[in-house]
Structures are given as structure tokens and as C-alpha cells.
Amino acid sequence: MTLSSLAESLWWIIPGKLGGMRKPTADQIPTLSQIGIDALVSVMDDPSNLDLYEQTQIPYLWLPTTGGQSPTVEQIEQFQQFVDAQHALAKSVVVHCSSGRRRTGTFLAAYLITKGSSAREAIQAAQRANPQIELRDAQISFLQELSSHLGVSF
């Protein structure tokens, strides 16, 4: 897969700062910085690629989440802390799962909720950024519960 096809799979929910994509292949990992990716969050339920992230010295966080399922509130807290720390260093962060549409969309929408967006606003922002987002009912419910937990109205 070429650099341009890798760039085409990348989408930004906060332009140039926070985005999503499908899982990068081993040969793409060394080129991530060329398309503006400084740090990664893997939400795959297996540790694939983590050793490659270490070898290429790209900052990463692994928050294993089963496909079609929701993360935990604790995972969202870890995610927010990692993203905020990377942003403080002027680094962009990209989240990936297998396809970059369900778990990735859930985490990115959750981040917006932690910053004050309602669940509805966060889901709409994710869908505008990537119309192929396919959140499951459990993921939508989680985002609504997170919004309520954080005191943000629906």
C-alpha cells in the first residue's frame, strides 16, 4: 500500500491534532510521520503492531477493546490523558482499530465528550469527519452514559 493510500485512510476529528484510521501495516509504520501522525493509540483487542511501534519509537498507548464493544470509563480517562500529554508536546495523535470505523469512532467521540461536547454532538462530529463511521448500539449507549457521567447534556 502506498503512502497516498495510507493518507486516504486517515481522517481528522480535530484537524491535524486528533484523528482515526484503520490499522497500519508493518511497512507503513515507519512512514506515519510523513502524513502527520506523531503518536498512536491502538484499541485493537490484540497486541499486534505494538512491538513495531516500539521499534520505530513512535509514542503509543494500547487500550484493548473488543470489536463492536465499548471501552471503559477508565480507558477513556487514560486516552484523554495520553492525548492531552501529546498535544502539550505539539504532537498529533491517531487512533486505530481494524477498520477505523467503530472502536476508533467511539474513542474519538468520547474524547470530544471529555472536552464538553454532548454525545449527540460528538457522534455527529465523528460522522462528519468520516461518513463511514458505524457505531453499534452499545457504543452509542456508552457515549450517552459517558456524557451523563461527566455532566454534559445529551
In which residue ranges do the predicted regions lie?
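Conserved G/P- and acidic residue-centered "switch" motifs that form tight phosphate/ATP-binding loops
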Residues: 100
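Ser/Thr-glycine-rich phosphate-binding loops at phosphate-binding pockets of nucleotides
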Residues: 104
